[in-house]
Swiss-Prot record:
PROSITE patterns: CASEIN_ALPHA_BETA. Residues 1-15 form the signal peptide. It is found in: Secreted. It comes from Mus musculus (Mouse). This is Beta-casein. Mammary gland specific. Secreted in milk. It comes from the Eukaryota. Important role in determination of the surface properties of the casein micelles. GO terms for cellular component: extracellular region. The modification Phosphothreonine is found at T26. Keywords: Milk protein, Phosphoprotein, Secreted, Signal. The modification Phosphoserine is found at S23, S28, S30, S31.
Length: 231
């Protein structure tokens, strides 16, 4: 029994020694780590201080080099330019008199060219003036006559009907005595010559006028009493 108690005491003593050694070792390790961390911080501070000092030295060199260079534009040492006043007794420069131009100046070459052109090219002939007799002859050649209706080989009743329509227009003759029909009658007669072959034989004057107004509304046909024409 005593032996067992002694063994327990020895074991407890050994356990205490091991815990003490372990704690001491951990304390030493933590102290070493803290020392290393402190050393690293010191090194970083030293490096930062060295960089700041190097930058300060560089800036000082640059500033000193800028101050040592001479100024490109020394305005302070610039001398004033002397300006002598112009004397008032100087006469103005004489200018040539201005002659007003009366028109474009033609060169001798252009004048000779125009003269040569006038001699080579013939002048245009003037158109003769038309007198009243010439105009009347031209109009008379274009105005149809009542005899032209008979040349269309129409029935006698239709020819008489067309003649009545022509005679219903006002008798406003031209100046010349050779014309037998007025201008309105000539227009109607020309129009009747175009439509006469297509008209029926038994037709009153009123029906014919209405038919002609439908064909040509631009011509104003006079109103005549309604009666038929027999052969």
């Amino acid at each position: 029994m005593k032996v067992f108690i002694l063994a327990c005491l020895v074991a407890l003593a050994l356990a205490r020694e091991t815990t003490f050694t372990v704690s001491s070792e951990t304390d030493s390790i933590s102290s070493e780590e803290s020392v290393e961390h402190i050393n690293e911080q010191k090194l970083q501070k030293v490096n930062l201080m060295g960089q700041l000092q190097a930058e300060d030295v560089l800036q000082a060199k640059v500033h000193s080099s800028i101050q040592s260079q001479p100024q490109a534009f020394p305005y302070a040492q610039a001398q004033t330019i002397s300006c002598n006043p112009v004397p008032q007794n100087i006469q103005p420069i004489a200018q040539p008199p201005v002659v007003p131009s009366l028109g474009p100046v033609i060169s001798p070459e252009l004048e000779s060219f125009l003269k040569a052109k006038a001699t080579i090219l013939p002048k245009h002939k003037q158109m003769p003036l038309l007198n009243s007799e010439t105009v009347l002859r031209l109009i008379n050649s274009q105005i149809p006559s009542l005899a032209s209706l008979a040349n269309l080989h129409l029935p006698q009743s239709l020819v008489q009907l067309l003649a009545q329509v022509v005679q219903a227009f006002p008798q406003t003759h031209l100046v010349s005595s050779q014309t037998q029909l007025s201008l309105p009658q000539s227009k109607v007669l020309y129009f009747l010559q175009q439509v006469a072959p297509f008209l029926p034989q038994d037709m009153s004057v009123q029906d014919l006028l209405q038919y002609l107004e439908l064909l040509n509304p631009t011509v104003q046909f006079p109103a005549t009493p309604q009666h038929s024409v027999s052969v």
